[in-house]
């Protein structure tokens, strides 16, 4: 999980979702998981 100011899709499997007002990227590759903060 990376915490970044701007979250972007890295690969085709990445999905951008909003959970409790927090923008997240979830992916099969753990390295690609991101959270905005």
Swiss-Prot record:
Top-level taxonomy: Bacteria, Pseudomonadati, Thermodesulfobacteriota, Desulfuromonadia, Geobacterales
UniProt keywords, alphabetically: Ribonucleoprotein, Ribosomal protein
Any coiled-coil regions, as ranges: none
Recorded superkingdom: Bacteria
One GO CC term on file: ribosome
Keyword Acyltransferase: no
InterPro entries tied to this protein: Ribosomal_bL36 (IPR000473), Ribosomal_bL36_sp (IPR035977)
Gene Ontology process terms (BP): translation
GO molecular function: structural constituent of ribosome
Identification of the protein by name: Large ribosomal subunit protein bL36
Family membership: Belongs to the bacterial ribosomal protein bL36 family.
